[in-house]
């Protein structure tokens, strides 16, 4: 389901470089599998794939079916890994434009999945409340600790709003949190909210295949079993060191990091994959960016950003590498019409497909950027479907673990994010 092409990037290295670093990469890979590396207690994201819980998947599907039946809007409150994974999968696989209402019910075929609690904009919350007025709303509050300021502040605003409008407000609130402790856990106990547990040993940025991501994804009408088992299949494939694309990706990134490269661009040519880019950005930024190490991850969308950042990528400082995330098989090609004239200068494209033009844009950018001194490689998804996307998610999670171990850091903690919180809470007068 995943293919990794690093042939062009290898031309920027000596012939023996990749093989020379491979023993270290394989050792990092064994640390992950044998649970001997730093942060090994946070490998719950692998454990849940090694022992799939089909009963949990069925329960999530049942809850999602109720929400799809009852809700106009499903509102997810979360920040970072508590929303980026779900948003990425939904943007990649759900319809991009709202379906027409059903004639008999005048209700959308699927509830609208919205996100809040991922920033501190009061204006956004006010406009959100106005938008929700008169709509049937369910809320999913996602926070392992129950102390995440952005998320819990949004819930503090929304809870009385829900209680004032829905007699069954407690049933409409679903929390995803620690199974045994924390403020959100205790609130669920007090008010009788339904709960889903974030499994032990799963950090936020690795939680997309837990109820954190699976419930919103299921509400959006996406097949979570195919998504989950696509990841299971990739997890099994990546157990071996031979023909291991995640190991190759981590090793290549490490080689360029050690040669002074500072930035990795993840470039997509399919707008639906932009959310995967945002999820990838957090995954690699929080996992690697410590002890003065790590490539700065930046996700961009082509061909749009070729008209803004393309100049820098082509001729700016030579301190970046570029990874393309592409889809091999595109469904339902759109043919460019023959309009009978050439007033727009595009008659040479008549009869070809928009997808073909997009592919040539990728091929052109790949060659031009490589010729301009940027090491480029490509991660290929087989198709834009739940199984392939699940494989993609696991591929990047596995790769970042190896990459962190290669750098000599714990890829599963994020001590630096506490610094701004301490200053913010001090300024707010929190005791």
Regions picked out by a protein language model, each given a short descriptive name:
Residues 65-239:
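Glycine-rich phosphate-binding loops that contact phosphosugars or nucleotide phosphates
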Residues 62, 122-130, 250-254, 326, ...:
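Short, charged beta->alpha transition segments
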Residues 391-431:
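Generic C-terminus detector
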Residues 298-383:
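Helicase-primase coupling helices
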Residues 165-323, 328, 416-431:
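Active-site phosphate/pyrophosphate-binding segments
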Residues 59-72, 128-137, 252-262, 313-318:
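Glycine-rich phosphate/diphosphate-binding loops that line cofactor/substrate pockets in enzymes
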Residues 82-85, 122-124, 147-150, 181-185, ...:
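Flexible loop/turn segments at secondary-structure boundaries
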Residues 1-65, 339-349:
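Extended, charge-enriched "interface" segments that sit outside catalytic cores
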């Amino acid at each position: 389901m995943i293919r990794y092409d690093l042939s062009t990037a290898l031309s920027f290295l000596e012939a023996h470089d990749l093989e020379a670093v491979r023993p270290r990469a394989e050792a990092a890979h064994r640390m992950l599998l044998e649970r001997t590396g730093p942060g090994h207690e946070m490998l719950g994201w692998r454990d849940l794939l090694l022992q799939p819980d089909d009963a949990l998947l069925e329960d999530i599907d049942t809850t999602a079916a109720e929400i799809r039946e009852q809700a106009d809007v499903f509102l997810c409150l979360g920040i970072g890994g508590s929303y980026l994974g779900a948003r990425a999968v939904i943007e990649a696989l759900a319809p991009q434009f709202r379906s027409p209402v059903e004639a008999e019910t005048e209700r959308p075929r699927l509830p609208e999945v919205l996100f809040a609690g991922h920033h501190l904009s009061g204006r956004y919350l006010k406009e959100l409340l106005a938008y929700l007025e008169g709509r049937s709303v369910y809320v999913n509050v996602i926070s392992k600790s129950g102390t995440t300021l952005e998320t819990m502040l949004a819930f503090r605003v929304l809870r009385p709003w829900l209680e004032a409008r829905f007699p069954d407000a407690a049933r409409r609130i679903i929390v995803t949190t620690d199974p045994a402790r924390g403020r959100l856990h205790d609130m669920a106990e007090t008010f009788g909210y339904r709960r889903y547990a974030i499994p032990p040993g799963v950090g936020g940025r690795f939680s997309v295949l837990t109820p954190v991501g699976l419930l919103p994804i299921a509400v959006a009408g996406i097949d979570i079993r195919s998504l989950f088992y696509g990841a299971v299949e990739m997890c099994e494939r990546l157990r071996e060191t031979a023909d291991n694309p995640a190991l190759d990706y981590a090793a290549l990134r490490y080689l360029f990091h050690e040669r002074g490269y500072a930035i990795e661009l993840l470039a997509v040519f399919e707008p639906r994959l932009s959310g995967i880019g945002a999820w990838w950005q957090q995954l690699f930024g929080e996992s690697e960016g410590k002890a003065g190490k790590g490539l700065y991850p930046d996700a961009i969308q082509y061909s749009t950003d070729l008209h803004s950042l393309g100049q820098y990528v082509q001729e700016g400082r030579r301190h970046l590498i570029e990874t393309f995330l592409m889809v091999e098989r595109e469904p339902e090609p759109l043919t460019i019409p023959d309009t009978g004239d050439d007033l727009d200068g595009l008659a040479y494209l008549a009869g070809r497909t928009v997808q073909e033009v997009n592919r040539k844009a990728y091929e052109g950018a790949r060659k031009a950027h490589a010729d301009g001194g940027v090491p480029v490689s490509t991660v290929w998804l087989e198709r834009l479907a739940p199984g392939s996307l699940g494989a993609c998610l696991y591929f990047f999670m596995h790769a970042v673990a190896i990459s962190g171990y290669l750098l000599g850091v714990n890829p599963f903690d994020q001590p630096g994010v506490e610094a701004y919180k301490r200053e913010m809470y001090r300024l707010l007068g929190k005791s």
